[in-house]
Amino acid sequence: MLIPHDQLEVDTLTRLIEDFVTREGTDNGDETPLETRVLRVRQALTKGQAVIVFDPDSEQCQLMLKHDVPKELFD
């Protein structure tokens, strides 16, 4: 299930993005400040390049690039 990013509370969205950009293995030694990484993800969500996917079985949300999301989730 896709969750529109603009329907989340600002604090909730920020925590979700911060969790994503600070997750082990996502920085690859990148020294970019947290605020910049959060801004980039927020922009990708706004442009429709990234989406928030909710898995009802695990009750977890994850950020994904739009082209990596199974097409059936867009129907």
UniProtKB/Swiss-Prot annotation:
<comment type="similarity">
    <text>Belongs to the UPF0270 family.</text>
</comment>
<dbReference type="Pfam" id="PF06794">
    <property type="entry name" value="UPF0270"/>
</dbReference>
<dbReference type="InterPro" id="IPR036685">
    <property type="entry name" value="YehU-like_sf"/>
</dbReference>
<dbReference type="InterPro" id="IPR010648">
    <property type="entry name" value="UPF0270"/>
</dbReference>
<protein>
    <recommendedName>
        <fullName>UPF0270 protein PFL_4336</fullName>
    </recommendedName>
</protein>
